[in-house]
């Protein structure tokens, strides 16, 4: 055991002050720790890549990085990997690739642990979230009758649906069983369009695509992607170096200079209108392994992020609203369009909009990814119906200079949740009150029931998840 030294998350916007911290070597030690601290609050952490309060805790902290085994097996006609909770995605991909396999769904960041990734609904584009493919969760919790620490296997029904995206609220995840597939290649190329209709029309031939709305230029750069039976391109390695230098590092270094050193809004707008687009090579078609194509070095530099999920039928309105709000926040406009101004007045948010004026200059491409509906209780894409689209807003401002972004993120979350039923990503900045958040999820009551069954004393909660479980927000409560 180590005394609970203070820790910060990746974004330096959350601070953890545990009373005690452990790095157990196996499942048996986890059970021993639970028995030793019976009645105290206990939370697990991964690599702390969450910006939300899901990572916080002032009780006992478990870092499960040593529980990182990977075993790939056939289960009928499917491949299923059993993965230790603390295994990072990058290690998992490497181990699976040795067996000629990979994950169905990948997020941009591979530094996350598997337990952390599924607990917050991590996703890529064009498929379901990672949580959707989970077929079993091995969980340490307490026996309700004896009070002893035990291991539960969740493999069916609502307990499994809850465990697929749990916010760490059911117990301590020890291992995850997740469906895999044979390794495959992805072909990718970029185009640019001024029309969202062109972007959406390209989804049929390129179902794995994601796209970026460039602020201040207001055009869409489309990263067309699809599975490809052809072998890896001869220039794939050169393309990876180009991507690393241009996007993973080059773009962000430009933005860091403009935002943190020059602090010039005029130069930021100029960069997005003229300079950054010049570095994006259009129509260079390259085929490479999926686990290389579908990820980025998104964690190379410290940043903060909010991501909002809207249904397909709300996407066009949501993007139009986004563009107008960014112009107001950046001081380029003083009012929304008549329709959107009326909407804000009906919500009673005129003061919030006025307070945002000229407070924040957005300085990163808005990434939009399509996520298919999930078989979970509370992932952001849970529920049948139309596909979801995740709009990501990132700021590279220094932690001490994030007040403008905080105003922007709060306004966007509050307004878009009411106007477009947008759901904030559980693992990113999540500024809504508990009642508002739970009202966005029709099956939150079922999730609450599973939590209360597996953790009746609430020992695996922090203040934030406790507030969520105690909230009485019902679907439709908020306009």
From Swiss-Prot:
It is a single-pass membrane protein. The keyword Lipid metabolism does not apply. Its cofactor is FAD. The modification Pros-8alpha-FAD histidine is found at residue 49. Pathway: Lipid metabolism; fatty acid metabolism. Residues 14-183 form the FAD-binding PCMH-type domain. Its EC number is 1.1.3.20. The chain crosses the membrane at residues 241-258. This is Long-chain alcohol oxidase.
